[in-house]
Regions:
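HotDog/MaoC-like acyl-thioester-processing domains
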Residues: 69-71, 81-138
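Generic hydrophobic/packing signal
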Residues: 14, 22-23, 30-35, 69, ...
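Hot-dog-fold acyl-thioester-processing enzymes
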Residues: 1-59, 113-138
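Hydrophobic beta-strand-centered segment that forms part of the acyl-chain substrate-binding groove
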Residues: 38-76, 82-83, 88, 103-105
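Preference for bulky hydrophobic residues occupying beta-strand positions
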Residues: 7-9, 63, 79, 93, ...
């Protein structure tokens, strides 16, 4: 199974050509990422950060820009988790427009850290592994 959500592309997200300005793809990805925690673990991302005291800094990101997304389009994001390591999680993103055209893909690796010691890795908790299994892919 995957996490799937949609969002309209608003004017502040586009450049003068009226297409999504490239840094906004990562902004959109992060917004969908935060939303995915409600689907997988039943909690808002701020609960993970401030109550569970767990952070996930991004340590690697690769993306392919395949087709422009324009002002007013609806982007559908699909997120899967291809790998959960001891201390890291790999996230795969696919953005499609309202016509189903694949526009952007990305693979991102985040590292699990303690919010009190963000520079120190920690093991991905078992409860989190169980939650993320909902969107784990092979």
């Amino acid at each position: 199974m995957a996490f799937i959500s949609q969002r309209r592309i608003d004017f502040p997200m586009v450049d003068l050509a009226k297409v999504v300005y490239y840094p906004r793809f990562w902004d959109l990805a992060h917004r969908f990422y935060e939303e995915s925690w409600e689907f997988t673990c039943g909690m808002h991302y701020n609960e993970i950060l401030f109550e569970k005291k767990i952070a996930f800094p991004l340590v690697h990101s690769e993306a392919k820009f395949l087709h422009p997304i324009s002002y007013g389009d609806t982007v559908e994001c699909t997120i899967t988790v291809p790998r959960i390591g001891e201390t890291s999680i790999t996230w795969h993103y696919e953005f499609r427009n309202q016509h189903g055209t694949l526009c952007w893909t990305a693979d991102q690796v985040t590292v699990c850290t303690d919010m009190n010691e963000v520079k120190s890795k920690m093991a991905v908790p078992d409860w989190m592994r169980e939650c993320l299994a909902k969107i784990e892919s092979s």
